[in-house]
Amino acid sequence: MGSITTSRLLLIGALGLAACGRVYISPLSPPPFRTEVPAGYDVTWAAIVRTLGNQNVPLRAIARDSGVIASDEFVSPINVYADCGEVGGDQLEGEAIVSFTVFAEPEGTSGTRIQVNSKMRTQAHRRGKSGKLRTAPVYQCASTGRFEANLLDAVRDSVKR
């Protein structure tokens, strides 16, 4: 009977300590960013590649025949391209590792469908605006949509010229 009581006390103590931990609130991941550009595939493809180059995005793979461009991972301040959520009511600040994959496919002869997928996680973060940057734990982040919107606005402007 003594060992059951001890086990219960240990369990209650462990649950009590776990309840004191900070709650991590993850941002909801948005769906992939999709749009259509009113220009042919070749013109749009050239505009996408030129725009990514102008924005100095490191590229890992370009496959024109399949319409895929994959960026390499690069560092971005949290809350510019990546929303990394909150811990205990404090917004995460610091740096995030982000990467994007752009898919393009012809839509008839005068249009191109584009989809941008994103993948993001914290690299060095802190709770709130002060404190030491930490590398662990790593939190998954969601796109703010800013990179995608800026990219496609620049592509649309480029194909109009």
Label each PLM-derived region with a short phrase.
Residues 14:
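Extracellular glycan-targeting catalytic surfaces
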Residues 21-161:
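Ser/Thr-rich, low-complexity intrinsically disordered terminal regions
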Residues 17-19:
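C-terminal motif of bacterial Sec signal peptides marking the signal peptidase cleavage site
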Residues 1-10:
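Bacterial N-terminal signal peptides that target proteins for export
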